[in-house]
Design a protein with these regions (language model features):
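Long, ordered, helix-rich scaffold segments
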Residues: 1-226
Length: 226
């Protein structure tokens, strides 16, 4: 019955309804995963969008395997980019790695650049120190070797650094990339410097405390002078 509903005239509604039960029903989830794998390529864009949204309840590997071709075909549609991102559910870093290795994503296109920025920002919001350190290490190389993906990742991280009000991610030490920011051109240097707002490391807290102490001392002297 589920299979017939998913390809019938009520298919979009069927996907929405069945995904609610699939999260707690492994058998139904397996059926949905198989049906999505077999029908997404021939589905109308509206149905493909719903399949992308429903993929949030899929098992990790099936989810990533399905969302990659969907993102590749429909990356120029903002709603699809949002749908894929919402279904990744903390798997943005793994998805980023997957797309980075995909030859279909080697060529630069503005929608792809936007999507990479969205993925990088999502990784920053998640705040996993290991994932963020890996991204910083990827970006820590000469500017001449930067490709469009690297610049998009840096833009996404820097944008999130400007907007984020979340607690800073604790690192074991200051990232080497931040220490070498002045070795890059003005645009990249500015974005790299912004990344410092995402992190805290031994020594950074001391500097901030010292700056705050100096400010308080200055205010105290002004009050005493009055």
């Amino acid at each position: 019955l589920a299979g017939r509903l998913l390809i019938g005239p009520w298919r979009r509604a069927a996907w929405r309804i069945l995904e609610r039960f699939a999260a707690a029903d492994p058998g139904l989830r397996e059926q949905l995963q198989a049906k999505a794998k077999g029908c997404w390529a021939k589905a109308a864009p509206e149905t493909a969008l719903q399949i992308a949204l429903s993929a949030g309840c899929f098992d990790r590997d099936d989810k990533l395997a399905l969302l990659a071709p969907l993102a590749n075909r429909y990356v120029d549609i903002p709603l699809m980019r949002d749908a894929v991102l919402s279904s990744l559910q903390d798997e943005e870093y793994a998805f980023l790695l997957q797309l980075s290795k995909d030859e279909q994503w080697a060529q630069q296109q503005l929608p792809r650049q936007i999507f990479f920025e969205m993925l990088a920002a999502a990784v920053a919001r998640k705040g996993d120190a290991e994932e963020l350190t890996a991204l910083l290490e990827r970006l820590d190389r000469p500017e001449s070797s930067y490709g469009w993906q690297d610049k998009a990742l840096l833009n996404g991280l820097a944008t999130q650094a400007l907007q984020s009000k979340a607690r800073a991610v604790t690192l074991a030490k200051r990232p080497d990339l931040l220490a070498r920011a002045d070795q890059y051109g003005p645009a990249l240097e500015k974005n790299i410097e912004l990344l410092a707002q995402l992190f805290i490391w031994p020594g950074k807290e001391v500097v901030q405390a010292a700056e705050k102490s100096q400010l308080l001392d200055a205010e105290g002297l002004q009050a005493f002078a009055k």
